[in-house]
Curated annotation (Swiss-Prot):
Protein localization: Cell membrane
Primary location class: membrane
GO BP: any one term: transmembrane transport
Keywords: Cell membrane, Membrane, Transmembrane, Transmembrane helix, Transport
Membrane topology, record value: Multi-pass membrane protein
Cellular-component GO terms for this entry: plasma membrane
Similarity-based family: Belongs to the autoinducer-2 exporter (AI-2E) (TC 2.A.86) family.
Organism classification: Bacteria, Bacillati, Cyanobacteriota, Cyanophyceae, Synechococcales
UniProt-listed PANTHER family: TRANSMEMBRANE PROTEIN, TRANSPORT PROTEIN SLL0063-RELATED
Transmembrane segments annotated in the record for this chain: 14-34, 41-61, 72-92, 155-175, 215-235, 237-257, 262-282, 310-330
Protein's UniProt keywords contain Phosphoprotein: no
Organism: Synechocystis sp. (strain ATCC 27184 / PCC 6803 / Kazusa)
Taxonomy, superkingdom: Bacteria
This protein's name: Putative transport protein sll0060
Presence of the UniProt keyword tRNA processing in the record: no
Amino acid sequence: MNWPNMPPGDRRWLWIGLTLPLCLLNGWVLLQILDYFQSPLRIFIIANLVAFILGYPVRWLQRYPRLKLPYAVALVLLTTAIILAVIGLLVIPKLVDQIRTVLQLLPHLNALGDRHLESLDNLSNQWEIPTNFRAWGRELSNEFPNQIRSITNQLINLLIWTAGSLVEAGFIFIMTVYLLLRGQTFWDGIFRWLPIDWRHKVRQRLRHSFQNYYIGQATVAALLGVSLIISLSIFQVPLALLFGMFVGFMAFFPFGGGTSIVLISIIASFQSIWLGIKVLAIATVVDQVVENGLAPKLLGRVTGVHPVWILLSLMIGAKVAGLLGILVAIPIASFIRDMLNDFI
């Protein structure tokens, strides 16, 4: 085979055919390594994510007030601790009260929902539409307590894991501080392992992928959550804080905002059909204003990854590393796409 004289198209497909099996084999080996070193890798990834987010205010303090790096890091960590403490003291007690209220109202909401479904059945019978909303409602009602118990058990396990992982949390904090102070030299050493022609491009693409995704998703989630809390409170919707924080948290994940809006609307409709419609209308308007009005002007292009690849990367990330895999799946997919576009 005369490689230099091959047509460019054939050469490209031959290169893909030769490298694809090697990539799959290396990927399988990488999965085994990730599974074996799960705990230290989890500490490393979380510390890097926290340092990546806190690095922005640190660099800002170095640039404008011209603080030295250790003082900037100390100020950012202290400010973050104060903000978390204030949120814990002011928001969490009210949030816990609203969660307790929802749990106490579950039997009542179940009965109300059954009556609403009966009304829908009667209406559909008048129009001679073959439906059986009550049967569907009973199936959901029978399954709902099981899901609540499952979620409760998961929360208890999470609390046990949190109590037993204080050492891990300490390692995360220490590594975060070191990455804020000496992260530049650490990554310089990592990227020296790459070929000279790749170093700058890989580093730039990797930073841009994570930066675009996390800044974009965090901005949209914060704007959506705060705007929804304010809007629902203005219209005197019960559980406005719980609904707004839930939607804001879910909006950090792709497709989470719309899914959570539908979910809170269904929960509100168990109390009153008009309340559910009201919540759906308010949340939809706020979501459209944030995602189609404010977010594009503030963020522009975020990842550019096709929705199908987003779903696939989320499923793969969840399979490989659970919630942590979901958090890093989209920026990694964006990075891989950019690198393939550059080198293929």
